[in-house]
Each structure stands twice: as structure tokens, then as C-alpha cells.
Amino acid sequence: MLPYVTHDPRFSQLVIGHANLEKLASGCRWAEGPAYFAAGRYLVWSDIPNDRMMRFDETDASVSVFRSPSFNSNGNTADREGRLVSCEQFMRHVTRTEHDGSITVLADRHDGRRLNSP
């Protein structure tokens, strides 16, 4: 028996038969937007209501706060150079976290108007 319920049979095509679910962290109120960084062997995700981003380090199974405040980040991904790209709802822009930890705003306007919670 699977440790989860599926509502669409197509989901089974996405799951590797021998893969196991593993709880990585607790205390998140709304965890979403995972982005995996293979070179660093870590996973980053957003905990939107707690206004933070979390990080799971695969090498030692530790969980830590990656960024707080996160400005209600969401929609995370890794770019081709291994940098984090996020949509920050509160600040209404799309950012990139550089390798040195600095943050670059990639977009905050379209047609001269502010983005609306990207």
C-alpha cells in the first residue's frame, strides 16, 4: 500500500516504483516550490506564510533556514549556472540569488507597470 493517495492514475507514471517518500522537515506552514541543486547536493523550498526559504543538505540530512525574510518567495528554479531564481510575491518581482549570496532583480515590470505577485 502506498503512503499517499492518488486521485489521477497518470500520477503513477511519474513515480519510480522503488522510490520512497521521506519527510525532510517539519514546522512549515505551506511548503512548496522545491528546487534541487545537484552540484551542491541540496534542496531549497519556500515556506510562504512563515516568510522564509528552507534548505535541506543531502550530505548530512540537515535542514536550515536558507533565507528569511523571503518576501513570500515562490516558484523557485535553478538556472543553467546553478543560481536560484524565485518569484517574490511581496516585492512583486523575480530575483536571482547569485553564487555570492547577493540578489539580482531580473524583472519587476511589464509594459511599464509593476508585476502583480509573480
Where are these regions (language model features)?
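Sequence-structural signature of mature extracellular/luminal beta-sheet repeat domains
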Residues: M1-P118
